[in-house]
Amino acid sequence: VNADVNPEEGLRAIPAPDETEVAELRAVELAAMLIGRHLSLLTSPDRRRAGRLDRVSYTLLTRLEADPLTLAELGRVLGIDVSTVNRRTAGLVEAGVLERFPDPDGGIARRFRLTPVGRRLLASEQRVNLRALGTALDGWSAEDLAELARMLGRFNHSLEDASGLRWEA
């Protein structure tokens, strides 16, 4: 931890929340942090045991499942440096999970897509995650699950609006 780093640096242009919102925003911030922690803990024993995908690779493959993207597009969507995306995709290509192909729109850019092995691996990861979620949410009604999905979708869209990082390329 670097005590000289100010976590509020760069936030000067963002107005501070109204005092009446602070408690609610703190509750949302805590809930979001705990959701990430709990989801990771629910699925990490299976991932470690099976040598499965880490969270960044899982996110990258999930995004590429929708449609092929270039390194620059992946970096923009994931909010990480292109050199990091390049290293990550190189390992996944070497493992036979992704393949590069020429961009049909021309130019020198190459796109990435899942191979059949990559699709099977991603489907397996998704099954692990769905089993863990199914266990955690056992007893929730279909209506409650639909409402949770709707609110989380809305929350994600608000985060995208605030960050400028879009899941879509």
Indicate where each model-derived feature is located:
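Charged, amphipathic alpha-helical coiled-coil/dimerization segments
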Residues: N6-E8, A90-A146, R150
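N-terminal helix-turn-helix DNA-binding core of bacterial DNA-binding proteins
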Residues: S40-V85, T89, E94-A95, R111, ...
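N-terminal leader segment of winged-helix/HTH proteins
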Residues: V1-R55
